[in-house]
Structure formats: structure tokens, C-alpha cells
UniProtKB/Swiss-Prot annotation:
Organism: Anaeromyxobacter sp. (strain Fw109-5)
Catalytic reaction(s) noted: (S)-dihydroorotate + a quinone = orotate + a quinol
Pathway annotation: Pyrimidine metabolism; UMP biosynthesis via de novo pathway; orotate from (S)-dihydroorotate (quinone route): step 1/1
SUPFAM superfamilies (alphabetical): FMN-linked oxidoreductases
First-listed, main subcellular location of the protein, grouped into a coarse class: membrane
Protein name: Dihydroorotate dehydrogenase (quinone)
Amino acid sequence: MIWPALRWTLFHLDPERAHRLAHGALHRVPPGLARLRRPAVPPELRVSCLGLDFDGPIGLAAGFDKGDASIAGLFALGFSHVEIGTITPRPQAGNEPPRLFRLVEHRALVNRMGFNNAGAEVCARRLAGVPATARMGPVGVNVGKNKTTPNEDAAADYLACIDRLHPYADYLVVNISSPNTPGLRQLQERDQLDALLRACAGRLRERAPGKPLLVKLAPDLSPTALDEAVDVAIDAGVSGIVATNTTLSRAGVERHPRAREAGGLSGAPLEALATSVVRRCYIRAAGRVPIVGCGGVMNAEGAYAKIRAGATLVQVYTGLVYGGPGFVRRLNDGLARLLARDGFRTVAEAVGADVETAERAGV
């Protein structure tokens, strides 16, 4: 009963101010209290992936914590993993506000934040100061390039982030798919993608052998370009693929006054598109690397659809904004019920189930 009233209050504030207030509250949660308040995750949801152990598939997508390292408070919500970022080598303010917009009727957001963060050095110091007791699961760091860095020099930015942040990350994610940094998505083109990911994978192997490196792809790639990106990424040495980022499409929200705002759309309108991209990545990867599903997950059924489409892990952000602090617990409990309903003993048994069913049916 508390969340509806709190949501009413927060949703009457500017979206970015509401985010700062919520994030600030989570930042102040001490590790001991976080462990006491953290909801139990059903044991059948445990996942082994990327050489790491997760107590469930549901994690926090990059974008919520941009380097403040509010680790304990975020794990207290029930997440199995938390992804920090996007972090750039040098501090940057991001785009001019207003830059975050709610489309409440559609349970969606449009953002053009622009990688606002304090930079890799500050983020590294903050992560170094996080006590071990606050880390209740894997912590990933999502990295990008500064807005002022031309694409031909982008690799240096990503390598600088890897060098500074890898000691504090259980895995790293190369973000080349945000629509809010001019020209960034061009790095998904074959030659640029291959060179960038080979450089990043090689550097991480030198600095921290065995540590996973993932790449985050856009949902707006053509089927052919998506297949090519998956192949190039795997050949370059990535350990997994995050599918997807926000979309430039406004399908389903065209008439909303905020639909005209520049930026990436997230939330419920992205769900079907993101799930289709997860499925295609899963088919193309053919078991070579795991897929992390992200985009439009607003309930347990949506998370389960991502898993059945091929996601081993699932990340959320906009669903948390609309669903509140009990959102992750509801996802986990709902997933356990859905697995049991369909006769799956573990998440791993359900991964790609819809793809395999379709293949057996000749679809």
C-alpha cells in the first residue's frame, strides 16, 4: 500500500529529480540492513553464467546507477546482479535537461541522458570503497566513450575504462548502442565493431584473464546487421551479448506528446521488439555465448518470455521505475511459479524453450 502513494508523489516531480531522490535513498542503505531486508530468491532460480554464480536471473540494467556505487541498496531490492554505468574515461555532464520523460499511459520512458557520469577515476574510487558485504552478487560495469571523442579514437576510451575499472567489476560491458551519443551506433558496423571488440577483449585478457566482456547491441539493427554483429562480436572474443538498448522507434506511442522528444524509448512498448532481438541473437549465437535479455520487462511473464526466447539473464530498469521497490521480488516469485507450471526445474532448462519448440514444429 505504501508504493502507490510514494509513486504518486514521485511522479508529480520532475523525472530526473525523482530519480535522484530514489537513488539517494538506496545509496544510504547500509550493507547490514540491506542483507536483512533483501527478499529471499527461490533456489530454483539460481543461474551459472559467464563463469559467475547468480542467485537468480534478474539484474539491474545500466543507466540507473551511473557510478555512484549504491551497491547495497540495489541488492536489497532483490537483484541477482547490478550493472553500473555507463562510465566514460573523463567526466561529462551529459545532454542538457530536460532529458528524461515519462509516458505514463504506456509505462514507458524516453531518455537522452548522454552518458552523464563522474568519469572512470571517480567511479573506480567509489567502487573500491564498497565493502565486500555490500556485494551480494556480481557487479558489472558498463563502459562507453566520451561525447567529444571521435569514433576513430573510440578504442582508446574503452581501453582506458577497462584499465581503470576492471579490478572492481565482475564483468564489463562495451556500450556501443546508446542513441544519445552522436555517432556511437556506427561502432556496430562490421569493421569498426571487429576492431573495437578485438582491442577490448585483448586488453581485458591481458589485465584480468578469464574476466567476462560483453557487448550491448541496439534493437534497431536490421536482421542482417544484427546477425553480422553477433558473429563479429563472438569472433572478436566477447563472452556474451546484452540485447538490447533503448529504441529510436516510437511504434505504439506515436500520439503521445512526449513521443516527439529525441532519445531512446524504453519500457512496455519496447518489450516485443527486444524479445524478438533476444531470440535472433540466441539463434545466431547457437550456444557460443549467453544472451542477456533487456528491454520492456514489466512483469514476471515478460521476464519469462525473454528466458524462453533465449536469455540466460534478464535486466530491468524502466519496470523498476513503474513497479517500485517490490518489483524484483514479484518478478522472482512469479518466475518460480511459471517455471513450475511448465515443468522446468531450473532457469537453464527454460532458456530458449520457445525457439526449440518452434524448430520442432518447423516454424
